[in-house]
Design a protein with these regions (language model features):
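Periplasmic polypeptide-binding modules associated with outer-membrane biogenesis and secretion
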Residues: 2-184
Length: 184
């Protein structure tokens, strides 16, 4: 194994520790790296589009089984999963296993989008117009990136109506039942 380790993990000092294979980055001895043997995504199981969300979480990650990672890479992947727009929360836990570290990624999916409402002072834009913007997304998991793109369409409509300085604030809270209220 040592000859394999020496050629495969160039730039790392390898050692066996508590039945785990540990690779330490020689450039920064304070940062310990570990071999990832398995990645499990949890939290999507009871969601109507769960399988799609599980794949979205996997696709957002740079870490794959067999990767050697440190905390910096874990944090990057945690942020990447969250930045995908599909999840309102993400946590990464680890478990020691016989072949390395098992990563358990616990995700909290956004709800299924049911309705978007504008809380506005005057009714320049109708709720029917708002529904026409979001109609294709009703009944699907709320993706905050796609949602932001739709808000930009509404802002442009306000500009066309002469309200160029108008701001649409992101929702303070998204209800669990999928109703989003935007403050205008």
């Amino acid at each position: 194994i040592n000859s394999f380790n020496n050629s495969f993990f160039r730039g790392f000092e390898t050692k066996q520790e508590n039945n785990l294979f540990v690779a330490e980055n020689k450039k920064n001895i304070n940062e310990e790296s570990v071999l990832i043997s398995e990645i499990i995504i949890e939290g999507w199981e009871n969601h109507p589009e769960g399988r799609k969300l599980e794949l979205a979480a996997y696709d957002s990650m740079s870490i794959k089984p067999g990767s050697i990672v440190d905390n910096r890479i874990l944090n990057q992947d945690l942020n990447s999963i969250y930045a995908s727009g599909w999840f309102s929360g993400v946590k990464i836990k680890s478990q020691d296993g016989p072949l390395g570290v098992r990563l358990i990624v616990d995700v909290v999916p956004n709800p299924i989008l049911k309705k978007v409402e504008l809380k506005q002072i005057n009714s320049v834009i109708s709720s029917a117009y708002v529904d026409s913007i979001f109609n294709n997304y009703y009944g699907t998991t709320l993706n905050l990136n796609e949602f932001q793109n739709k808000i930009e369409i509404i802002k442009k409509r306000y500009e066309e109506e002469g309200y160029s300085l108008l701001r649409i604030n992101s929702p303070d809270r998204i209800s669990d039942d999928g109703v989003v209220i935007l403050n205008v």
